Each structure stands twice: as structure tokens, then as C-alpha cells.
Amino acid sequence: MKKIVGILAAAAVLATSVFAADVSAKVKLDGKLLNVDTTKEKDGVSAVSIGHNTDESWNPVLNMAVSGDNYGASVGFYIGKWDYGEDPSKWQGWNHGYGVGLKEWKIWFKPIDVLKFDVGRIDQATNQESIDYDTRLFNYDEWGYRVGFSTNGFTLNVAFHQDHDEFWFSQAANGDAITKGLNVFASYGADFGTILAFVDFNDTFRDIKAAAGYNNQFGDIRLFVDAGIQLDGTKDQESVFGAGFDVGFKYAKDALYFEAYARWFENNFEVLGKEGDPMYLYFKAKFSYKLDPCTLFVYFKDENLMAKKFASTIKAGATGSVGSCNWECYAQIDTGKGANGDKINFAIPVSFSVAF
């Protein structure tokens, strides 16, 4: 590990004399001052823990990026490692639980100003909330190739995407042809706002997602809305039709911030209103107010407001910084716990991070 870091550091120093290089790192620790678990026969109480949240697959420990006028690349170290199957040359999946590994590899280049190619880890999404940056109507985040054309506010991206080290097209002898993800994304921005379209084909064109969206900034208010349909098909069965929409609202002025996001989706209209209907209404909101020593906030999230049991996450606390060190401390209540969904969990989580 030391040898790898040394090589990367030397490469970064050498790179600065040739093109723009950026090396960023982040040290983040998460813990709990108190945890009360009421899901057991007798309430369990524990206190004072610290560690690293390995579930934050989006949070790199170390990121290196280089760029020139018309090209660039980046690679990221994350907590976790690639798992291998019987064939040691094949990466089977990312394991969050142990070690440090290189997960994100990206290269881009522009033969001409309006044309851009991305290879490696690529992603695309409809409008996305900025409370947790993890919720949107449709998206993909995989490995592949993407070509993008941009001019005068118009953007068109076409991408072939699939799992790591997987072929987009394959056909065994005397077998059926199999294709993975094909995505087309277009957007146009002007004074009236930005309109977008998202179409994704997967599983040999049997799984289809299509959406249209709009977003705009009205002074201190940002609004967006998306509506889409999906067709979930298999080789031997009829396709299942679903549809949904999402709405985002954000207000930020001076010390005040409020954001809310809602997403409704029906995955299968054939069972609409029946037992086992997968329809859901996802909702989250956050309010914060900046003071001199810290920022106070209240947070609410429920993954399905239409569920029979009230299962939500409620947070109230503060965030702040001392120099480059950021801290967060809050009380958290999780409802809907236990086998019957009638228990709660109470905790006081803390986190500390320094980015450099």
C-alpha cells in the first residue's frame, strides 16, 4: 500500500509540470454517543463508539485528477475492495466491508470543443435533490462509453453502460444475443429554465425507462419536476408497466435554507389498489438556519408515506467547523422498527471530517 501511495504521489508531482493536477483527500470518522435499541425483549443501551462508515461508497478517501485543455482523468480510493470469483481476472462486485481499493476510474477527452468522450465509470440522471444527493426518478451509474455533443445550451449524450469488465453485447454459440444498457439523454437550457429527456434500454431492450423533466431557478427558489414510465420485461413473460413522478423544491437565502423532495411511483399497474401493490410515496425534507458558532437543522425522511406502518427517520442537531475540520452532532429517531414495525430506535450520532 505504501509503495502504491508513493508512486501516485510521485506521479502527481511530475504531472504538475506538464498539465493541471489535483489531489484531494478526506478523512471522515463516524460514531455514536448513545444508542437505544427498543426492538429487543429488553431495551439495549450502548454508548460512545467511533469508526468509519463503510456504506458511504460515494465518499472517496483519496481522489486524484489530472486535466489538460481537452482531456482529463481521475481515479478514487474508497473503503472496500473488489471481490473476485473463480476467475481471478474478473471483478465480481464491490465489497464495502473491508480494506481500501481503487473503485472509480474515469477518462475524458474532447477532439473538438462541442464533442466529448467519457470512458470508465459514467453516470446520468434526471433531476436530483440536494438534501442527500441520492434520490432521483431514474438514473444509471455503471461502467461504459459515452459520447456527448453540446452547443448553445443544448446537450445530447449517448452511452453504452454495463457492469465492470462486462461485455455490452454477447452471444454464445447457438444462443440468443444479449445486450446491456443503452442510454440517451438530452437537455436544453434557456431563460425559461432547462428541459430534459432521459431514455434507458436494458436487458436486451426488455427493460425500458423514459422520462421528461424541467428545472429552473426563480430568485432564491429552485424548482424541478420529472415524470416517467418504465417497462420491466423478461424473455418469457409479459412486461410489467409502471409510472411515476417526482418534485423538488429548494429555498436558500442568507442564513435560511429549506428543501423538500417527493417521489411517487407505481411499479405495476396490474395490481393497483390490490394486496401487495408496490406503489409508494417517498418524501424527505430538511430545514436549517446558520448561526455564528454552528448551523442548526431538522431532517425528516419517510421512504413510503403510504405504508400501513409509520417508518421514518427524524434528525435534529447542529453542524459546524473548526478551521478545516467539520463536525456534526444530532439526535436521531427511527420509527417502524422491529418485526411488527411498532418499535423505535434512538441515537445520538456524531461525525468528524477534514478534507484537503
Indicate residue ranges for each PLM-predicted region:
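Cleavable N-terminal export/targeting peptides
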Residues: 1-24
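Transmembrane beta-strand segments of Gram-negative outer membrane beta-barrel proteins
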Residues: 20-42, 117
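Outer membrane beta-barrel
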Residues: 23-24, 53-166, 182-183, 187-190, ...
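Sequence/structural signature of outer-membrane beta-barrel proteins
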Residues: 32-41, 78-92, 122-134, 161-177, ...
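Residues that define the transmembrane beta-barrel architecture of outer-membrane proteins
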Residues: 48-60, 98-105, 139-145, 150-152, ...
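Outer-membrane beta-barrel strand-turn architecture
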Residues: 67-70, 111-113, 150-155, 188-192, ...
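Detector for outer-membrane/organellar transmembrane beta-barrel domains
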Residues: 187-196, 200-308
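Outer-membrane beta-barrel "beta-signal"
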Residues: 322, 343-356
